[in-house]
Amino acid sequence: MKKTFNQTMPCAVRLAALLLVPVVCVAFFGCSAVPGSSGSSAAEPSPSPAAAEPAAKPDLPSLRPLYQGDENGYYTFMTAASGDYQQVLYADYQTGTQAPACHITGCTHDSPSCPACFFTGVPVTLPCPVGDGTYLSFVYGYDSDGMSIVRLNQDYGVEQVLYHCNYISSFYCCTDGSSLWFSTCPSGDSYDRIKRLDLSTGGITTLFDAGDTSGQSANIIGCTGRQLVVSVSPYYDSSEPQTSCLYLVDADTGTAELLREYPITNASAGRTTNISTAVLDDTLYEYDYTTGELTATGLADRQTCTVTDALPPDPYEGRGAFDVTITRILNGQLVVEYYSNDWTDDNAETKTPVYLVDLAAGTVAEKPALPPLNWNGYDHTSTTIMAQLQDRLLVLCRTEPYTRTTTGTDGAPYTIQSSHRYFGLISYADYLTGTPNYTEVGMLD
């Protein structure tokens, strides 16, 4: 008999969101040599190959990010009105309906026998479709301490534990439908490795490691074809020069090529380098905070061109944290999000404008904002994007206030004013023009 999560998970398990979009590149000390790769956890450094177009692999699918949904729908958690349990819900884009993720005919979805109900704990991530009816999840404490990658059955119960470790990064994982690429720090080690997991056999291969210096991390920040873009960083130490490095790693062989080295600067501005990076549509985009220049480098031919130098400067002129995040490409427009605040003025509002860069013309325009949403007493002007589909975005689109009752530490009940948040689909065109034309598909909380 196959177990379900709610029959095995301990109470201390906490839910963590699966993040898909990398925000900043990170750092690595001593990047001039390529770290160990090609299936060995302690391989000798190998020289970087010359920049060249990667060999074609027509018989193998391209990699894609793993997340809690696909073109057909999206998984969420919801706490039951009674507060006794949580449910996994599935929002179906085709029907526009949201329902418990349970395939048992006649189930009332309110007892431990329902695989969508969790009375004693929840996985770290929701079901993540990888194709052909296969789902993965990242869970804490399944059978032992630490974290596991598990394959789920059709009722979202644990079918097989594929990999177990003390730490697995679920922030950015890639799949081709048959394998999973992820970052992990094995038990007893102090630096990260990029591993490939065969989803059929559970076989594990180390493709790339961050070296043997304590505290070094390696994180996947993007993918192109069957290659990973990996950012390698050290534990920050202001007493010595350090650099942040990007590598292009072959997902099959582990062959690594050093793409970039960025000096780590003073972290007082809220970031560690003067370059913000993103990997979109087989291209590495880089924004230079010092010059204001935005460039694009093709990951196949390594040709670099200037996209624009017309992005506006920091609204608060360096008086606080300032972040520029390159997020996505929609209808030929590169979406660039700003975050700026003023540490010298306690009353200053955080500014979060969004700019659109026309990739053909290089022109820059501020994106018209969608109407702000108010929840828990505050206006939220930034649009929360949950997923990007082929021609639509899944976004938070509506809120609704409500009153809920809970119990204090003294056992006495009390009420809390809160908000339900709803999500829906919006076309690229409507998002870019700030037109709130949503197709609502579900409730987030």
Describe the residue ranges of each PLM region.
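Bacterial N-terminal signal peptides that target proteins for export
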Residues: T4-L19
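Hydrophobic alpha-helical transmembrane signal-anchor segments
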Residues: V21-V24, S38
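C-terminal motif of bacterial Sec signal peptides marking the signal peptidase cleavage site
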Residues: A27-G30
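Bacterial signal peptide processing site
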Residues: S32-P35
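N-terminal low-complexity, Pro/Thr/Ser-rich intrinsically disordered segments
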Residues: A42-G69
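Surface-exposed loop/turn elements that mediate protein-protein interactions on large endomembrane-trafficking
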Residues: A50-D59, G83-C114, S144-H164, D189-G211, ...
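Repeated scaffold domains used in trafficking and secretory/extracellular systems
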Residues: D59-D70, P112-P129, Y167-G177, T213-G225, ...
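Short beta-strand elements that form the blades of beta-propeller/WD-repeat-like
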Residues: R64-Q86, P123-G141, C173, S178-P186, ...
